[in-house]
Curated annotation (Swiss-Prot):
This is Translation initiation factor IF-1. NCBIfam families: infA. Residues 1-72 form the S1-like domain. Component of the 30S ribosomal translation pre-initiation complex which assembles on the 30S ribosome in the order IF-2 and IF-3, IF-1 and N-formylmethionyl-tRNA(fMet); mRNA recruitment can occur at any time during PIC assembly. The keyword ATP-binding does not apply. It is found in: Cytoplasm. InterPro entries: NA-bd_OB-fold, RNA-binding_domain_S1_IF1, TIF_IF1. GO terms for molecular function: ribosome binding; rRNA binding; translation initiation factor activity. One of the essential components for the initiation of protein synthesis. Stabilizes the binding of IF-2 and IF-3 on the 30S subunit to which N-formylmethionyl-tRNA(fMet) subsequently binds. Helps modulate mRNA selection, yielding the 30S pre-initiation complex (PIC). Upon addition of the 50S ribosomal subunit IF-1, IF-2 and IF-3 are released leaving the mature 70S translation initiation complex.
């Protein structure tokens, strides 16, 4: 089964929300709700407000995303 077409955008975490979700402001000034990817949870990578992250989104719902990478 082929993986869906995903869109990746860099952004900055602006707010921490319950249940490992975050409000992320993308570089194109849009704000979305994003949750951490499973590998980030498994490896216990912490995401805090102000962190630069890479967000993966589907073209079907551009208001939600998945945080796949935290820049150092």
């Amino acid at each position: 089964m082929a993986k869906e077409e995903v869109l990746e955008f860099p952004g900055v975490v602006t707010e921490l929300l319950p249940n490992a979700t975050f409000r992320v402001k993308l570089e194109n000034e849009h704000e979305i709700i994003a949750h951490t990817a499973g590998r980030m949870r498994k490896n216990r990578i912490r995401v805090l407000a102000g962190d630069k992250v890479l967000v993966e989104m589907t073209p079907y719902d551009l208001t939600k995303g998945r945080i796949t990478y935290r820049f150092k």
